[in-house]
């Protein structure tokens, strides 16, 4: 019986590597992939802190096809592929429809497709203003900067906001035209609750239509960033929420969301057809350099240091933007790929 290593949780914040049976192809359209990398996603961080025994993680894997069923036509043995689940072990078996081939000019760590298709899907859903108008992105980590790069490609000017100065530098690097700490935002970028009492109505209406942004994308996930994003959205504008995945409830100003008639859009990727098309689109754009979001500082950890990778998510700012675990190599000191 062939075996493989698998990462499972022993409890909150504590994982272990166990040995299990390697999956075997038993359907004609299945492929077997030997993993190289799996991304460490912030959306799993809260669940990692509260994980019960036996819980597994890893939805950002990539690797090499080592075996295919007799009916497989999309990929062949030796192809590098990425997918959206099953990154918690050395090998993964899945139907060929769930794998996406990585272009030859894209490095392994650059070809982790799941977060990239989430970005393409999210930006495809938003209501963009005309070219050269300003939109805002609140939260400028890996996902926020990816969204900034795509929005800039679409011809709008992006104003970036984050609580970390290092993240603002990244935002400017990936396409933002302006970048601010929350307390430094210009007055005209923040909307106010207007009751129309004691003011000229025409002036009030004009002010409501000119302050804030017609589109704000939120990638910070905290109550503070969500609340700020609401206050930055113009009357009748659109607030696109991309990062609120896990954790408890958030206390935000829903009243302002309502009285300003803000269109609130969840960009969470739940449409399988759109996810597939977004993944294929992302791979094409990376392959032909239409989308230059490949050169992202990435820290690599051995699978045995999965917990350390999560611990360091909160101190990465200004040092690296993305973390991955390496299933091919063991017992090495974590290092940063800064290309």
Kindly give the residue locations of the regions a language model identified.
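Residue-level marker of beta-strand positions
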Residues: 6, 30, 60-62, 80, ...
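NAD(P)H dinucleotide-binding glycine-rich loop of Rossmann-like/cofactor-binding domains
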Residues: 80-138
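ADP-ribose/adenylate-binding Rossmann-like module
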Residues: 233-250, 265
